[in-house]
A protein has these predicted regions:
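Short helix-loop-beta connector
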Residues: 40-47, 69, 130-131
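Glycine-rich Rossmann-fold phosphate-binding loop(s) that bind the pyrophosphate
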Residues: 52-54
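Rossmann-fold NAD(P) dinucleotide-binding segment
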Residues: 110-112, 119-138, 146-147
């Protein structure tokens, strides 16, 4: 969670105190969309594989839909009810089908795979990848297997220090790999 404080720069008094969760979620979604624009090429059709149907799953989809036509989404969440809510909420942003996966492997068939879960276990396996798939492991813990990271063609981060401190690369950074 976060808090946004708006302070008058001339007088130094508070103008507003706001919950920062929404803007943080939107920013994180935008990071993926902008990175994808440069890695994949703007304007292409996308089949999105999504792990995590919470607020981050929503904002990731919304941001990607700003730059790409999402022709299909396959979403996996440990809570089927959350995946069903996501599917209903995201209809305006997706130009095609929204599939709810009952097995995490089923969401790995997209052009991109976005992991936005709170899982502390490595559940995304390297062998699930299709050649050319772009993986965005956005969670605070390591959602993808070591092999996903070690066999990646490229690893792109927005902030090296933060990437080595938490998320998919933390274990690799702390062990010097």
């Amino acid at each position: 969670t976060s808090m946004i404080l708006l302070i008058d720069p001339h007088l130094g008094n508070f103008r507003a105190v706001m919950d920062g969760a929404y803007i943080t979620n939107m920013r994180t979604g935008a990071q993926t969309a902008v990175a994808l624009k440069y890695m994949y090429g703007k304007g292409k059709n996308i089949h999105l594989g999504l792990y995590g149907a919470g607020m981050q799953g929503h904002t990731q989809t919304m941001a990607i839909a700003e730059l790409f036509d999402i022709t299909e989404v396959t979403v996996y969440d440990v809570s089927r009810a959350a995946a069903e809510r996501y599917a209903e909420d995201m209809k305006p942003f997706v130009k095609g089908r929204i599939n709810i996966a009952s097995d995490p492997r089923d969401a790995a068939n997209g052009d991109i795979a976005v992991c936005v879960t709170q899982s502390k276990e490595e559940f995304f396996k390297y062998e699930w990848f299709r050649p050319g798939t772009i993986l965005f492991p956005m969670g605070s813990y390591q959602e993808c297997s070591d092999e996903c990271i070690e066999k990646a063609d490229k690893i792109v981060v927005d902030h090296v220090g933060q990437a080595l401190h938490r998320g998919a690369l933390a274990k690799h950074g702390s062990s010097g790999r």
